[in-house]
Design a protein with these regions (language model features):
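Ligand-binding loop in jelly-roll beta-barrel domains
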Residues: 80-105
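Structural motif
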Residues: 28, 58-60, 67, 83, ...
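Short, conserved beta-strand element in jelly-roll/cupin
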Residues: 33-35, 46-61
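Histidine-centered divalent metal-coordination motifs
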Residues: 43-45, 84
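A short, N-terminal "cap"/entry segment at the start of jelly-roll beta-barrel domains
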Residues: 1-30, 41, 77, 107
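Short acidic-glycine-tyrosine-enriched beta hairpin
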Residues: 66-80
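Short strand-connecting beta-turns/loops that link adjacent beta-strands
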Residues: 25-26, 47, 91-92
Length: 107
């Protein structure tokens, strides 16, 4: 299945948009669309690893106690149990492809 990811991107005025791209019994693929100033608050997943790949824009990603600035083409892995989150501190939209494995029970 081919997906034109950037064509699916849409921002929401009040919070980060999370768009489901694909799901299997072993993985979940989402697109996060983050407007300037929006964030995903730090949180943890007990059993899931999360992989972030930045497609467009720039943002600050928290991983444990560390912060990393990522731009288009950069990636970051948040292992299960490690607190993580992100904020768009740029002035353009931030698009991030996110792979979660295994998928959460509600997926």
């Amino acid at each position: 299945m081919r997906i034109r990811i950037k064509d699916l991107a849409k921002l929401q005025p009040d919070k980060m948009a999370k768009i489901a791209l694909a799901a299997t019994p072993r993985a979940l693929l989402d697109l996060y669309c983050v407007a300037p100033g929006q964030e995903q608050k730090p949180h943890t997943h007990g059993d899931q690893d999360k992989f972030y790949v930045v497609l467009e824009g720039r943002g600050r990603f928290r991983l444990g106690a560390a912060e990393h600035t990522l731009e288009a083409g950069d990636a970051l892995v948040a292992p299960a149990g490690v607190e993580h989150g992100l904020v768009n501190d740029g002035d353009t939209r931030l698009l991030v492809v996110v792979l979660v494995t295994p998928p959460p029970p509600h997926a």
